[in-house]
Swiss-Prot record:
Disulfide bonds: none annotated. This is Single-stranded DNA-binding protein. The gene is ssb. InterPro entries: NA-bd_OB-fold, Primosome_PriB/ssb, ssDNA-bd. It comes from Aquifex aeolicus (strain VF5). Residues 128-139 have a biased composition (Basic and acidic residues).
Length: 147
């Protein structure tokens, strides 16, 4: 099964870092994505969508220190559904678990941190690289047809 997400959006706030009991960093932030389209009358409309993103590990901790509100980033990850129950009601939420986050651009006036001074490759190059993983030959483990 394939579960892969690529989304470009702006951080709506600064990333929040917490730590698991094991000491593993957990970083959470929300991305805003604006969709622009023409309605039935031919007029342009815009609708905003917000996606919660969660990331784990040292790399995620690094992202939290490098990115802040307003930064435009590309998130590569997978969808995860969280389920819980509160006062007898069942709830569910889908969020993005980030595997990679790349800076596209920062808001005007944002200061560069020392480690960010490296040249950021053009977004076209980054998009072209996305999803290109080493291809593995298909092997059918079972000889029987499942129907």
């Amino acid at each position: 099964m394939l579960n892969k997400v690529f989304i470009i959006g702006r951080l709506t706030g600064d990333p929040v870092i917490t730590y698991l009991p094991s000491g593993t960093p957990v970083v959470e932030f929300t991305l805003a994505y604006n969709r622009r389209y023409k309605n039935q009358n031919g007029e342009f409309q815009e609708e905003s969508h917000f996606f919660d993103v969660k990331a784990y590990g040292k790399m995620a901790e690094d992202w939290a220190t490098r990115f802040s509100k307003g930064y435009l980033v590309l998130v590569e990850g997978r969808l995860s559904q969280e389920k819980w129950e509160k006062e007898g009601k069942k709830f569910s939420k889908v969020r993005i678990i980030a595997e990679n986050v790349r800076l596209i651009n920062r808001p005007k006036g944002a200061e560069l941190q020392a480690e960010e001074e490296e040249e950021v490759p053009p977004i076209e190059e980054e998009i072209e690289k996305l999803g290109k993983e080493e291809e593995k030959p298909f092997t059918d483990e079972e000889d029987e047809i499942p129907f």
